Curated annotation (Swiss-Prot):
Protein name: Alcohol dehydrogenase
Binding site for Zn(2+) 1: 37, 58, 145
Single Gene Ontology MF annotation: zinc ion binding
Keyword Iron-sulfur tagged: no
Cited SMART domains: PKS_ER
PROSITE patterns: ADH_ZINC (PS00059)
Organism the protein comes from: Staphylococcus epidermidis (strain ATCC 35984 / DSM 28319 / BCRC 17069 / CCUG 31568 / BM 3577 / RP62A)
Disulfide-bonded cysteines: none
Pfam family, one: ADH_N
UniProt record similarity statement: Belongs to the zinc-containing alcohol dehydrogenase family.
UniProt keyword terms in alphabetical order: Metal-binding, NAD, Oxidoreductase, Zinc
PANTHER family: ALCOHOL DEHYDROGENASE 1-RELATED, VACUOLAR PROTEIN SORTING-ASSOCIATED PROTEIN 11
Binding site for Zn(2+) 2: 89, 92, 95, 103
CDD domains for the chain: CAD3
Length: 340
């Protein structure tokens, strides 16, 4: 079968791979679609360590074509996800308290185990979440990582109906965060970016305000919008240091700043302001299986509609080049069916 494999020179090669036999608790999935995530770029570039030889992909959607004898959670024909959280231990302090993404023994698709940029993929049957049949599978691929990541981040922000949430970076993740915040949580949303095309798209999606922080002072604009109160919370999906710092600067006392994007950098924090204004800065890592079920359902109800562009597996290096240049709007999704 064809698979997108990380090479030593930080590129991706389309290679023929043979899968092993299923082990107890596993299922075999024929991949339909796989989204391309910024984390895939980090993995390819060895930002988290050298994983040469691994098959990329953690935004996979496909149909189960075989299950191991002892599997009863899935059956042949089910449409399921192949997500970043491939499997966890199920027994640690994190797994038993609803924080399974923090499990120290977690396995990650497309990083520590082979992922979904392949014609077929082996999954842990207990961690492959079923996809609603009325949800377009190409759109579902974006929900599998980008969607659940931003949905969870918006939940972590604690935003309530009518409050102001700032979304920093409104590309593939940010435009989904905007939709979950506005259409599910009932928040008012300010979109921040330095790309006018992305900001205009955010406006089309319902952003209450858009701010290009290279043209105006974001603090002044937020003060104007909120009568000098500041935002109730911010979510950062951008992958640069500046928006992380700005996301702290524009919030009110008692606000929460949620970090999602993964720039290889450090934040500058004004410690007296954090203490005196009671500002919380927290990280949010993807989402649990239950978060993913909820994220899928809201998408199935058309409350969140990912903007996807279908590409071919052979274009994977071109997609990464575009990603590094910052020219992508929405989500790039590889049509794996065309490679079968």
């Amino acid at each position: 079968m064809k698979a997108a494999v990380v090479t030593k020179d930080h590129r991706v090669s389309i290679e023929e791979k043979r899968l092993r036999e299923l082990k107890p608790g596993e299922a075999l999935v024929k991949t339909e679609y796989c989204g391309v995530c910024h984390t895939d770029l980090h993995v390819k570039n060895a930002d988290f360590g050298d994983v040469t030889g691994v098959t990329l992909g953690h935004e996979g959607i496909g149909r189960v074509i075989e299950v191991a004898d002892n599997v009863d959670s899935l059956k042949v024909g089910d449409r399921v996800s192949i997500a970043w959280m491939y499997a966890a231990c199920g027994n640690c302090e994190y797994c038993t308290t609803g924080r399974e993404t923090l499990c120290r023994d977690v396995l990650n698709a497309g990083y520590t185990v082979d992922g979904a940029m392949a014609e077929e993929v082996i999954v842990d049957a207990n961690y492959a979440v079923k996809v609603p049949e009325n949800l377009d599978p190409a759109a579902a691929s974006s929900i599998t990582c980008a969607g659940v990541t931003t949905y969870k981040a918006v939940k972590v922000s604690g935003i309530e109906p009518g409050q102001w949430l700032g979304v920093f970076g409104v590309g593939g993740l940010g435009n989904l965060a905007l939709q979950y915040a506005k259409n599910v949580m009932g928040a008012k949303v300010v979109a921040f970016d330095i790309n006018d095309d992305k900001l205009n798209f955010a406006k089309e999606l319902g952003a209450d305000a858009i701010i290009n922080s290279t043209n105006v002072d974001p603090i002044e604009e937020v003060n104007r919008l909120t009568n000098n109160k500041g935002l109730d919370a911010t979510v950062i999906t951008a992958v640069a240091k500046t928006p992380f710092n700005q996301a702290v600067d524009v919030v009110k006392a008692g606000a929460r700043v949620v970090a999602v994007g993964l720039p290889v950098d450090k934040m500058d924090l004004d410690i007296p302001r954090l203490v005196l204004d009671g500002i919380e800065v927290v990280g949010s890592l993807v989402g649990t299986r239950q978060d993913l079920r909820e994220a899928f359902q809201f998408a199935a109800e058309n409350k969140v509609i990912p903007k996807v562009q279908l590409r071919q597996l052979s274009e994977i290096n071109d997609i990464f080049d575009e990603m590094e240049k910052g020219t992508i709007t929405g989500r790039m999704v590889i049509d794996m069916k065309s490679s079968h």
